A protein has these predicted regions:
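N-terminal subdomain of nucleotide-sugar transferases
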Residues: 1-61, 411
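Conserved donor-binding/catalytic core segment of Leloir-type glycosyltransferases
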Residues: 6-8, 221-246
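A short helix/loop element that forms part of the nucleotide-sugar donor recognition site in Leloir-type
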Residues: 53, 207-221
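Carbohydrate-associated surface elements
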Residues: 179, 200
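Nucleotide-activated donor-binding/catalytic signature segment of Leloir-type glycosyltransferases, i.e.
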Residues: 268-295
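Short hydrophobic beta-strand element within catalytic cores of glycosyltransferases
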Residues: 304-306, 324-327, 331-334, 344
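Conserved acidic donor-binding segment of nucleotide-sugar-dependent glycosyltransferases
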Residues: 346-347, 351-358, 367-373
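A short, well-ordered alpha-helix in the C-terminal region of glycosyltransferases
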Residues: 360, 367, 374-389, 398-401
Length: 414
């Protein structure tokens, strides 16, 4: 009988951010491996997808948690501080227990944030099922970088401590990056129940392709070598810095286009930087594009740049987008923060530069723009490495050990 897994998520498809993309990849690959995954989303999913309903997608069943009625519903919908979080956990816990009682599951696998983890932990213990907690990023790091809270605030302390508590109660803990595993061990989580299951990519979807001549003509790119960024524009992604660095590179006589695709909290800053550096003649900021058109825009980008700044979040967490670029056989140039160093072997599968160092960036970018043979060699090896190590079909095999440990540890506590 296939292993039946209930994935508990903050949000999921049809929302298509990095969090949802990883979840899609995991569920699809587990299904291919003969497992039976189902997905349940929290009440917060409806804030991004108000018409959410239970559905099948890609052979996987998606359940939803409504945001409720009465005080709990008002707390969620009104985003009342603290009460909203309590309501989310209460509503989600009840929904998980209801699903477990009405169906048959072998594992409850919750994914951060800790609100999902706490609700799933309580439900799994109540129903005597093994509980796995997967941490995609430390919530408190993200909100600090967005300047929502400070490191000395009560919310920061509560968030970090709840995360640690959920991890301690879990029968197995998954982290997507090695620095996160080390951090969790430093919090007292036993190394024996910590597992590293990294980010992956659907290598069957992201395949090398010819330059889209029609789109190149439409955008006025032509055959000009192009630096590209495709992803969400958070401040720590460093895209506004990239505009400044590219302006310096142009001053040195290199001819290229800078193509930026995506949106986010830093969009206004990126636009401002393009204006202040006088970069509009060669910089194209296109905003968000339809998901099914992403590969067309990738095809115009000769060098994919990931200029993350060095902060705790970027040192800890590996991004998804460089893996898409590597699967496409692109030359990748990234800042040498921990999350990117975990993906790129310098001079073999990509190039690295010192975070925030314009001189180092210009040196590496010039080399890639001027030498097509170097770009091709790096891209070919990157694609080969992704197929070997980072295709979702390969990555999800790591969950077999995770689930075995969780079932063993759950048996010991029952």
């Amino acid at each position: 009988m296939p292993l039946r897994i209930l994935h508990v998520l903050d949000h999921s498809w049809p929302v298509l951010d990095g969090y949802a993309q990883r979840s899609l990849g995991i569920a699809a690959a587990q299904l291919q491996l003969g497992m039976q995954p189902s997905v349940l989303t929290s009440p917060l999913h409806q804030q991004d997808d108000p018409s959410a309903s239970e559905t099948f997608f890609g052979g996987v069943r998606y359940f939803r948690t409504t945001d409720g009625v009465g005080l709990a519903g008002r707390a969620v919908q009104g985003r009342w501080p603290f009460l909203r979080e309590l309501a989310v956990m209460q509503l989600l816990r009840r929904r998980i227990v209801s699903l477990i009682k009405s169906g048959s599951y072998d594992i409850v696998h919750a994914h951060s944030p800790a609100l999902c983890g706490q609700a799933a932990s309580q439900a799994a213990y109540f129903c005597h099922l093994p509980f796995v907690y997967e941490i995609r990023a430390f919530w408190e790091d993200g909100v600090v970088r967005q300047k929502t809270i400070g490191t000395r605030s009560m919310r920061y302390w509560l968030g970090k401590n709840l995360e640690t508590r959920v991890a301690r109660r879990a029968d197995a803990v998954v982290a997507i990056a090695r620095p996160m595993v080390d951090d969790l061990e430093s919090r007292g989580i036993p190394r024996a129940k910590l597992f590293h299951v990294p980010n992956g990519v659907d290598a069957a979807r992201f395949v090398p392709q010819q330059r889209d001549a029609a789109l190149a003509a439409q955008l006025g790119v032509g055959q000009t070598p192009t630096l590209g960024y495709l992803g969400t524009l958070f401040p720590w992604e460093g895209v506004s810095w990239l505009v400044r660095a590219a302006a310096e590179l142009r001053k040195r006589g290199l001819v290229f286009k800078l193509l930026i695709v995506g949106d986010g909290a830093d969009s206004a800053e990126v636009k401002k930087e393009i204006e202040e550096t006088g970069s509009s003649s060669y910089s194209l900021f296109l905003g968000r594009v339809p998901h099914d058109q992403v590969e067309r825009y990738y095809s115009l980008m000769d060098v994919m740049v990931y200029p993350r700044s060095s902060v705790r979040l970027t040192e800890m967490v590996t991004p998804l987008k460089p893996l898409e670029a590597m699967a496409l056989g692109k030359a990748v140039l990234g800042s040498s923060v921990g999350g990117i160093r975990e993906l790129i072997e310098p001079e073999v599968t990509g190039m690295l530069f010192k975070p925030g160092n314009i001189e180092d960036f210009c040196r590496q970018a010039a080399r890639l723009l001027l030498h097509e043979d170097v770009r091709i060699a790096l891209g070919n090896e990157a694609r080969r490495r992704v197929l070997e190590e980072r295709d979702w079909k390969v990555v999800v095999q790591g969950y077999e050990d995770v689930y075995e440990a969780a079932r063993r540890n759950a048996g010991a506590r029952s």
